[in-house]
Each structure stands twice: as structure tokens, then as C-alpha cells.
Design a protein with these regions (language model features):
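Short linear motifs in low-complexity or flexible loops
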Residues: 2, 6-8, 30, 77
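ATP-binding/phosphotransfer module of carbohydrate and carboxylate kinases, centering on a glycine-rich
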Residues: 3-8, 13, 17-24, 35, ...
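Short, positively charged and aromatic/hydrophobic N-terminal segments
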Residues: 22-24, 28, 35, 41-48, ...
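Short, often N-terminal, low-complexity regions
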Residues: 50-52, 56-58, 64, 69-73, ...
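Short beta-strand segments
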Residues: 113, 173-177, 216, 240-246, ...
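Short hydrophobic alpha-helix segments
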Residues: 134-136, 191, 261
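Active-site nucleophile and cofactor-binding loops and adjacent substrate-binding regions
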Residues: 191-197, 214-220, 240-243, 407-413
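Structural signature of FAD isoalloxazine-binding scaffolds in flavoprotein oxidoreductases
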Residues: 264-267
Length: 424
């Protein structure tokens, strides 16, 4: 097994041991961990003989982006095996072709989570951690140009807070509500923002300089964030479901965001799970969102409370609602924890319909991981414990093929920022 040993020779050196045909892989990890985006030269040291290296190409990976670098290195392990008749190579000496430049060897990206209420912007390092974050109100009724002005201002602020110029950022990503087209950099339509065929990427570039600017739907960006840095990290195929006011979704297939031919794909909240069922906010009947959103859980709780009042049945739902002044997504869960049977009935119904939608998603996409985000996901294991067995019971091929892992999302409200920053 290869190992990496770092050594401070002029503060620019790495020593790598291992099979030569694994040098590229080991070197990627060494550069990513230690030195950011610097180009290196690799020269094998064999006693006093230093053969002339050939020019090859290598991919140095930072998070999800592969940055192509030309490296001076041995072409293949065949040279070593042919000349030295052995499988392993001696240490490989690496040195930088350019100075470190004041230690700023890290790669930063900026992620913008644009919402109808707030604009949140974060500076993200190569480990996909948000190192600086700032926000301001969107004031969605304003002209789009003013909203983009504020996005640019926040980009400059987060860079300045870290002590770097905006020009030193490698890329910027925007997570926007609505139908967006990354190929053109446009928001085609957004329901809660005054955007119609808005060339938002070019508008932002004109304000911050000619940096690469990528764009994705906000739910897709959050799914991408969980895929690269959250609950689904390490998987190539994953789905994120957000259980909030509505049900949002994003699908990652073979490490790519599924958008559909018209950039309106993965509207998972509007798959129909009960024909002619509950009214959805979209105007249709029986959508998953009408059964599995936080709004749906609140409606179910209210209906159960009214039923209990009619039947003269006491329920802790009423006590908790009176104490807090309202019914929320937590009301039924908290009452159930306290042993209330009416609340348990509500929660079982909610989990049943949530499982129905998840089974459909698994049967269609067969993702390695489904991550659950949004307010309801804060229930954690209290939600997962009854949910997972119900899904396992109904999914096709359950117990025979490898099973999809259902997890609570890790990044919370930062998923959109991280996902936007790591767009490509």
C-alpha cells in the first residue's frame, strides 16, 4: 500500500513512496491535502541515476472539480519494471514549478444561495467547508439588477473577510429557485422572484470579473451539496428530499445533476401517490407534497385535533398547541413522545405516505443514498426508526439487491451554498 510522507525542504517538497503506476493517485491526494493548485515536477531518484521523465497529463482533484495539469513524470510503470525488474519504485522527489506566493495555496470557491427571503453567500475551501458566510434580505420585489448587485457585494465581502481578492476565487456558483439553465447561465422562470429569462451568470460576471459562474436550481444544488460533502458523500447516485413547506427534491445520477431536457426535472414533490387525493399547492390532486411536507403534517394534526374535539377525546395535541399558540410540524411528534395515541395516529399516517414516495423514488432511480432535509428531518432517528422498515417492506427487490441507505442530511441550511460552490 502506498503512503505519503511530507518533508519541509524549502517548504516545497513531498516524498512519495509506492508503486509507480499509483503515483498519480497518491500525488493527487498529496497535492489536494497540502498544496492547493500548484504544478509540480516529479523526478524519480534511483541511486545516482535520474532518467529523463516523459511528459504526461494528470488530473488533480479538488472536491468535485478536476483541474487538468500537465506534469513532468514517468509515463508508466513499465519503464521501471523494464529497467529495474521490480514492481515497486524508490522514492519520487516532487518540487514546485512556481513559488507558493505568500502561502495562499488554497483554492476557494463562492456559493450563493438565492432565496425569496434572503441571499446567503459563503466562501468554501477545497475541503468543502464554509469558512466565511454573510447574508442580506433579498427584497424580492426589486428589479433583478439590484438583487444581482447585492449578490456581487456579498461575494466581495466574503472574499475580503478571508483576506483575498475576488479575482483569487476559482469559481462562483448560484443556487436559484425556479427553472434554470446552467448551459446559458439563465434563470428561465422563478415563481417567487421577478426573473424571466434572466442572464444571471453574465450579470454577475460583469460585476465581479470574468470568473466562471455556474447556476443550478436550489433543490438540485442542495442535493449536489449533500452528494459531495454531506450525507451522500462517496456515492455516485443519490437523491435528496427536503421536507419543508413543500417537498423539494434533487437527483444525482453518475455524479451529475438530473435536470431533464427542459431543466425542469426532479419535481419529486409532485409525483402522484394518491389519485384524486388531497389538494396540492400546485392545484393538482394527490401529489406527494400534499402528504409529506411539513405543511401536510400540520394539516393532518389539525384534522386529528378537530376529530378528537368532535368525539370528546382528549389529546395532548391540544395542550401543546395551546401552550405554544399554534400547531407546527413538531406538535404531533412531541405529543407522541409524551404517549399521546391520537398524535401517534397522525405520525403513522405521515410516515406511511412519506414511505410511499420514497419507495417510488428507490424503484425508479435505485440511488445509493437518500438524504432527508428540511424541518421534519430534525426529528432524526425518531423519524427514521419507523420509516426505514416501512420502506424496506415495500421496495422492489428488498433484501436481495443492495439496499438504498436513508439518512438525515448533514449540511442543513448550508447545503445550497456548498452545492452551488461546487457546481461545474
Amino acid at each position: 500500500m502506498s503512503c505519503i510522507q511530507t518533508r519541509a525542504i524549502l517548504q516545497q517538497d513531498i516524498i512519495i513512496y509506492g508503486q509507480l503506476d499509483n503515483v498519480k493517485n497518491v500525488l493527487q491526494k498529496a497535492i489536494k491535502h497540502k498544496y492547493g493548485r500548484r504544478m509540480v515536477s516529479i523526478v524519480p531518484i534511483m541511486n545516482t541515476v535520474i532518467p529523463q521523465p516523459a511528459v504526461a497529463e494528470c488530473f488533480v482533484t479538488f472536491g468535485c472539480e478536476k483541474i487538468k495539469k500537465r506534469l513532468l513524470c514517468l509515463d508508466t510503470a513499465a519503464f521501471m519494471r523494464y529497467n529495474y525488474m521490480r514492481e515497486t519504485c524508490p522514492p519520487v522527489y516532487c518540487f514546485f514549478l512556481e513559488p507558493l506566493g505568500g502561502g495562499r495555496d488554497l483554492m476557494y470557491r463562492i456559493g450563493i444561495d438565492l432565496g425569496g427571503t434572503n441571499i446567503a453567500v459563503g466562501l468554501v475551501d477545497e475541503s468543502m467547508n464554509i469558512v466565511v458566510k454573510q447574508s442580506m434580505p433579498t427584497q424580492a420585489q426589486r428589479a433583478p439588477e439590484l438583487i444581482v448587485d447585492d449578490m456581487a457585494t456579498l461575494c466581495r465581502r466574503v472574499a475580503a473577510e478571508k483576506g483575498i481578492a475576488i479575482s483569487e476565487v476559482s469559481a462562483v456558483g448560484i443556487a436559484s429557485p425556479g427553472i434554470v439553465d446552467n448551459a446559458t447561465g439563465r434563470v428561465e422562470y422563478a415563481n417567487n422572484l421577478p426573473f424571466r429569462k434572466l442572464p444571471i451568470a453574465d450579470m454577475l460576471k460583469s460585476r465581479i470579473g470574468e470568473l466562471p459562474v455556474h447556476i443550478a436550481n436550489d433543490a438540485n444544488a442542495a442535493a449536489w451539496g449533500e452528494a459531495v460533502a454531506g450525507a451522500a458523500k462517496g456515492s455516485s447516485n443519490s437523491v435528496m428530499i427536503t421536507l419543508g413547506t413543500g417537498v423539494g427534491g434533487g437527483v444525482i445520477i453518475d455524479n451529475k445533476i438530473l435536470t431533464g431536457f427542459n431543466n425542469a426535472g426532479a419535481e419529486l414533490g409532485h409525483i402522484v401517490i394518491s389519485a384524486g387525493g388531497r389538494q396540492c399547492s400546485c392545484g393538482r390532486l394527490g401529489c406527494w407534497e400534499a402528504y409529506s411536507s411539513a405543511t401536510a403534517l400540520i394539516n393532518m394534526t389539525r384534522e386529528k385535533l378537530e376529530e378528537c374535539r368532535i368525539k370528546g377525546r382528549h389529546t395532548l395535541i391540544e395542550d401543546i398547541a395551546n401552550e405554544r399558540g399554534k400547531i407546527s410540524g413538531r406538535t404531533a411528534c412531541d405529543a407522541m413522545r409524551a404517549g399521546d395515541e391520537a398524535a401517534a395516529e397522525v405520525f403513522r399516517e405521515y410516515v406511511y405516505y412519506l414511505a410511499c414516495g420514497l419507495v417510488n423514488i428507490i424503484n425508479i432511480f435505485q440511488p445509493e443514498v437518500i438524504s432527508l432535509g428540511g424541518g421534519i428531518s430534525n426529528e432524526g432517528d425518531f423519524l427514521l426508526k419507523p420509516l426505514i422498515p416501512m420502506v424496506r417492506k415495500e421496495q422492489y427487490g428488498g433484501g436481495i439487491v443492495p439496499e438504498t441507505q436513508i439518512r438525515i442530511a448533514k449540511l442543513g441550511n448550508d447545503a445550497g451554498i456548498v452545492g452551488a460552490a461546487m457546481l461545474k
